[in-house]
Amino acid sequence: MYGPKDHGWIEVVAGPMYSGKTEELIRRIRRAEIAKQKVQVFKPEIDNRYSKQDVVSHAGDKIQSVPVKSSKEILEKLLDDTDVIGIDEAQFFDDSLVEIVSKIANNNRRVICAGLDMDFKGEPFGPMPKLMAIAEFVDKIQAVCMVCNNPATRTQRLINGKPAKKSDPVVLIGAQESYEARCRKCHCVPR
């Protein structure tokens, strides 16, 4: 999506783990670069699974990013000539991300946020619900359920091969060994 320079907007790519959110973010950023637009990509500093510096998809696609400690730091590190801003793992930021993203879009810039819309409990995750509400464009993508192969909309956390309990902490960064994509029917959160 490219538009006139006098319009900004917000795009959100949401879904469970292994649905291709980061791949889609990278694809959109690369297309903006092809369109000769200046881009910057940000990610939360706590996301260091595959790289401390780059945004990396589970499939191995990667793009250079600026790791930040807080959403406010995005404004501090945002360059004046940037046209398109990518934000990966948006769910890990606090609610001030919503105001910051709005401010950036109101300054005639395109903002693309990617993140989990629900936590492992199946509940709205961080600022994602509000970002989805204010965005001009929302793509909710699915993965494949690792149990029944139907479309998956949820992320199942596994601890020693068993579903995590509702009382477990929400934030625990991991990869395949601790998470699976699941459909509504196969998703399980014991009390």
Curated annotation (Swiss-Prot):
Pfam families: TK. It is found in: Cytoplasm. One of its GO terms (cellular component) is cytosol. InterPro entries: P-loop_NTPase (IPR027417), Thymidine_kinase (IPR001267), Thymidine_kinase_CS (IPR020633). One of its GO terms (biological process) is DNA biosynthetic process. Zn(2+) binds at C145, C148, C183, C186. Its EC number is 2.7.1.21. It catalyses: thymidine + ATP = dTMP + ADP + H(+). It comes from the Bacteria. The active site is at E89. ATP binds at G15, P16, M17, Y18, S19, G20, K21, T22, D88, E89, A90, Q91. GO terms for molecular function: ATP binding; thymidine kinase activity; zinc ion binding. The keyword Transmembrane does not apply. Keywords: ATP-binding, Cytoplasm, DNA synthesis, Kinase, Metal-binding, Nucleotide-binding, Transferase, Zinc. Belongs to the thymidine kinase family. NCBIfam families: PRK04296.1-1. Homotetramer. This is Thymidine kinase. It comes from Clostridium botulinum (strain Kyoto / Type A2). The lineage of its organism: Bacteria, Bacillati, Bacillota, Clostridia, Eubacteriales. The gene is tdk.
